[in-house]
């Protein structure tokens, strides 16, 4: 029977199939061995392992090895410094047009050319790429509101200002003049503001500030004139030391003589500073203070008067007498208590203690409960219930 069953299985199954004897409880369906999928790992097969063929340097021509020029390569332009500068200036001009400052910049440029004596050929070519000139440097220090409106006129004093005085100008003076020319008035009286600026708005009246709207040329002339006046007043001269002393408040010689008359014992430094330090001996106070001290404490010494402290002086004989009196009174108090009465008092005290011990009831001996007893456990639970 077993041979017939095995033959039947061989006929049903193909040659490639592996036949196993059927186990009890196993289905009669033929089980084939599962084939594992073939996986190609990266170290077995990878596109990166297909290396391209590396050609030798002999294949390259010398013309190909040379640097690519702007004519050979599309989209690449070799720009020199002049072209780059012109591009940058054009970009700046475009930005000025966007900010509505192109006309102002044009006025600065024309004023700079006429004031510095630039030749006609350079004026035609333009001053693109040149460093900022003194008028433009001055314009950079001005506030934005003035920078939009001020233009530099072409006059003779402008050339002198640029050539001589502008490098010596201080930032503080420029800012002071600029703030003065903006026309900001902070007068607290509205009537005065209305007199100076009748076209004042409601907001300007409320804030007590009026913005002067003037001609840009007039503002520029006022600005340059004030700066020139301030710089011409300096002229690089040193200040007189006497004037410096006077400005600092140092007294003059005549004032020093007056000080010597008032305070004859004054030193030179005290005369210069105008301060006199009174030298007083600590052991010799003022006469009025001594009189007051003598009135209150007649037996006071000179040092006690100076320090304001008086030490009481007592006769030693009086002190000895007081000491003897105190010792005598103490001995009398001790002798008043008789020596024979002491043992009797001790005996009575002992008898009282013995009687109290006899009459005292014996205490009951109570056993201390252990920590694990029921009573202690209940107490613990009561504590927990309280909380």
UniProtKB/Swiss-Prot annotation:
Pfam families: FAM153 (PF15722)
Disordered, as annotated region: 233-256, 327-374
Composition bias, Low complexity: 336-345
Biased composition (Basic and acidic residues): 347-359
Domain of life of the source: Eukaryota
Start-end of Basic residues biased regions: 360-374
PANTHER family named among the record's database cross-references: FAMILY WITH SEQUENCE SIMILARITY 153 MEMBER C-RELATED, PROTEIN FAM153A-RELATED
Similarity comment: family membership: Belongs to the FAM153 family.
Name of this protein: Protein FAM153B
Species of the source: Homo sapiens
């Amino acid at each position: 029977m077993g041979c017939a069953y095995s033959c039947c299985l061989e006929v049903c199954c193909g040659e490639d199939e592996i036949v196993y004897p059927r186990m009890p409880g196993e289905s009669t369906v033929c089980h084939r061995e599962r084939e594992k999928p073939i996986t190609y790992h990266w170290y077995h097969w990878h596109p990166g392992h297909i290396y391209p063929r590396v050609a030798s340097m002999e294949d390259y021509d010398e013309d190909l090895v040379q640097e690519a020029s702007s004519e050979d390569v599309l989209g690449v332009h070799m720009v020199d410094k002049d072209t780059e500068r012109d591009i940058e200036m054009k970009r700046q001009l475009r930005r000025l047009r966007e900010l509505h400052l192109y006309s102002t910049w044009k006025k600065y440029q024309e004023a700079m050319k006429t004031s510095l004596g630039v030749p006609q050929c350079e004026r035609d070519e333009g001053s693109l790429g040149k460093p900022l000139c003194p008028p433009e440097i001055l314009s950079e220090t001005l506030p934005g509101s003035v920078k939009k409106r001020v233009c530099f006129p072409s006059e003779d004093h402008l050339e002198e200002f640029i050539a001589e005085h502008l490098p010596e100008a201080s930032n503080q003076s420029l800012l002071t003049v600029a703030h003065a020319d903006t026309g900001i008035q902070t007068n607290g009286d509205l009537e005065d503001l209305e007199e100076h600026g009748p076209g004042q708005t409601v907001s300007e009246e409320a804030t007590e500030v009026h913005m002067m709207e003037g001609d840009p040329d007039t503002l520029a002339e006022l600005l340059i004139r004030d700066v020139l006046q301030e710089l011409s007043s300096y002229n690089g001269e040193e200040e007189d030391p006497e004037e410096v002393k006077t400005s600092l408040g140092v007294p003059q010689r005549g004032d020093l003589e007056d000080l010597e008359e008032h305070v004859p014992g004054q030193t030179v430094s005290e005369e210069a500073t105008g301060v006199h330090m009174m030298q007083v001996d600590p052991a010799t106070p003022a006469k009025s203070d001594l009189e007051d001290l003598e009135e209150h404490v007649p037996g006071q010494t000179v040092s006690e008067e100076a320090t304001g402290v008086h030490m009481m002086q007592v006769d030693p004989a009086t002190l000895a007498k007081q000491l003897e009196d105190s010792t005598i009174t103490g001995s009398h108090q001790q002798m008043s208590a008789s020596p024979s009465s002491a043992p009797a008092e001790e005996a009575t005290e002992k008898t009282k203690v013995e009687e109290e011990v006899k009459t005292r009831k014996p205490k009951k001996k109570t056993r201390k409960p252990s920590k694990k007893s029921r009573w202690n456990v209940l107490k613990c639970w009561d504590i927990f219930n309280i909380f």
